[in-house]
Curated annotation (Swiss-Prot):
InterPro entries assigned to the protein according to its UniProt record, in alphabetical order: CLIP, CLIP_sf, Peptidase_S1_PA, Peptidase_S1_PA_chymotrypsin, Peptidase_S1A, Ser/Thr_Proteases_Immune/Dev, Trypsin_dom, TRYPSIN_HIS
Protein task: Component of the extracellular signaling pathway that establishes the dorsal-ventral pathway of the embryo. A protease cascade involving ndl, gd, snk and ea results in activation of the spz Toll receptor ligand; acts downstream of ndl, gd and snk and is required for proteolytic processing of spz. Activation of ea requires both activation of the ndl-gd-snk protease cascade and sulfation of a vitelline membrane component by pip. Localized activation of the Toll receptor in the ventral region of the embryo defines cell identities along the dorsal-ventral continuum.
Membrane-spanning residues: none
SUPFAM superfamilies referenced in this protein's UniProt entry, alphabetically: Trypsin-like serine proteases
Family assignment from sequence similarity: Belongs to the peptidase S1 family. CLIP subfamily.
Keywords from the UniProt entry: Calcium, Developmental protein, Disulfide bond, Glycoprotein, Hydrolase, Metal-binding, Protease, Secreted, Serine protease, Signal, Zymogen
Quaternary assembly: Interacts with Spn27A; the two proteins are covalently linked leading to inhibition of ea catalytic activity. Interacts (via Peptidase domain) with snk (via N-terminal prodomain); leads to proteolytic activation of ea by snk. Sulfation of a vitelline membrane component by pip is required for proteolytic cleavage of ea by snk but not for the interaction of ea with snk.
Location of the Clip domain: 36-89
Active site, renumbered: 173 (charge relay system), 240 (charge relay system), 338 (charge relay system)
Species for this entry: Drosophila melanogaster
Name used for this protein in its record: Serine protease ea
Encoding gene, per UniProt annotation: ea
Length: 392
């Protein structure tokens, strides 16, 4: 039986939200027969008593308890009955083998300046499937790229992804592309943004309570680093990837957090044919601005030969450092940003985390034409370049 002190400890954890507000379990949240549930990490799970989920129970009793673990536990609650907390326990943690045999470590090669799974790509949001609108804390690595224009005016016209305390990844065409006006200078990034019309951003949750994020963070860019082999005038836009070095380190929060790079050797070589991924953003491009609210869409990776057949009609020859995804009318990277992320999900016995599968490069005009997938730079092909380029 779960000790009363542990019940009190867990309820105390659940009571504190990241915005400083309080949540007390209520009977409306009960699952009478417990049943199936989906974790904050987007895994299939079963709603059971906390003490019956050995992994999460062990996580709870770990000292000190990390903020990310505290928030994960809070958002994993699926009910409260007879004085006991119910927790959404992933299927893989209820298998006897996972409780007795340490899981294998992923085959990862890393630079010490880059965060590893567990430190990046965290999934803390209670995800809504099939929706277009993101949650306020969903995809906290997303960045808006700021340009300083003539007469000192500023605007956001590309996107990017935070990969460490000091670096953002975007597209090279957002740095020195042929469509960029000559009087624009890439000057900064905005992090922790959700609704560009408000600051701070607030969202009303299912309990009718207001959940507010801290004010967004504007950080100057110290140096832009387009890929050395990128050719702005090329039709196929090969090597359309760039690094932005920030002028200062950023502090991670629930709303500003890096995405993982595909460091696992299997991910580095993957082409993602038939794999469903997320594209997200404000629809910002070098020429247009579409939405004040961060949006998302699910897109499916396309076979390269099929995508090549489509783009051959435009005399565009794609290479193995690129990939295609989407092709459904009105979706695709219309909801993403130039330079923004194509987001994959890796589930293994150690961590479940989001990783940067691709960078939005180009697509049909107008975007979202049926039968025309968007083209993305395949980030796994550039891991070596990224690791060799970043500095402390």
């Amino acid at each position: 039986m779960l000790k009363p002190s542990i019940i009190c400890l867990f309820l105390g954890i659940l009571a504190k939200s990241s915005a400083g507000q309080f949540y007390f379990p209520n009977e409306a949240a009960q699952v009478p027969n417990y049943g199936r549930c989906i974790t904050p990490n987007r895994e299939r799970a079963l709603c059971i008593h906390l003490e019956d989920c050995k992994y999460l129970y062990g996580l709870l009793t770990t000292t000190p308890l990390r903020d990310t673990d505290r928030l994960y536990l809070s958002r994993s609650q699926c009910g409260y009955t007879n004085g006991k907390v119910l927790i959404c326990c992933p299927d893989r943690y209820r298998e006897s083998s996972s409780e007795t045999t340490p899981p294998p470590k992923p085959n990862v090669t890393s630079n010490s300046l880059l965060p590893l799974p567990g430190q990046c790509g965290n999934i803390l949001s209670n995800r809504i499937y099939g929706g277009m609108k993101t949650k306020i804390d969903e995809f906290p690595w997303m960045a808006l790229i700021e340009y300083t224009k003539s007469q000192g005016k500023k605007g956001h016209h590309c996107g990017g992804s935070l990969i460490s305390t000091r670096y953002v990844i975007t597209a090279s065409h957002c740095v020195n592309g042929k469509a960029l006006p000559t009087d624009w200078r890439l000057s900064g990034v905005r992090l922790g943004e959700w609704d560009t019309n408000t600051n701070p951003d607030c969202e009303v949750d299912v309990r009718g309570m207001k959940d507010c994020a801290p004010p967004h963070l504007d950080v100057p860019v110290e140096r832009t680093i387009p890929h050395p082999d990128y050719i702005p005038a090329s039709k196929n836009q090969v090597n359309d990837i760039a690094l932005l070095r920030l002028a200062q380190q950023v502090e991670y929060t629930d709303f500003v957090r890096p995405i993982c790079l595909p460091l696992d050797v299997n991910l580095r070589s993957a082409t993602f044919d038939g794999i469903t991924m997320d594209v997200a953003g404000w629809g910002k491009t070098e020429q247009l601005s579409a939405s004040n609210l961060k949006l998302k869409a699910a897109v499916e990776g396309s076979r390269m030969d099929e995508c090549q057949n489509v783009y051959s009609s435009q005399d565009i020859l794609l290479e193995d450092t690129q990939m295609c995804a989407g092709g459904k009318e009105g979706v695709d990277s219309c909801r993403g940003d130039s330079g923004g992320p194509l987001i994959g999900l890796d589930t293994n016995k150690v961590n479940t985390y989001y990783f940067l599968a691709g960078v939005v490069s180009f697509g049909p005009t107008p975007c979202g034409l049926a039968g025309w997938p968007g083209v993305y730079t395949l980030v796994g092909k550039y891991v070596d370049w990224i690791q060799n380029t970043i500095e402390s």
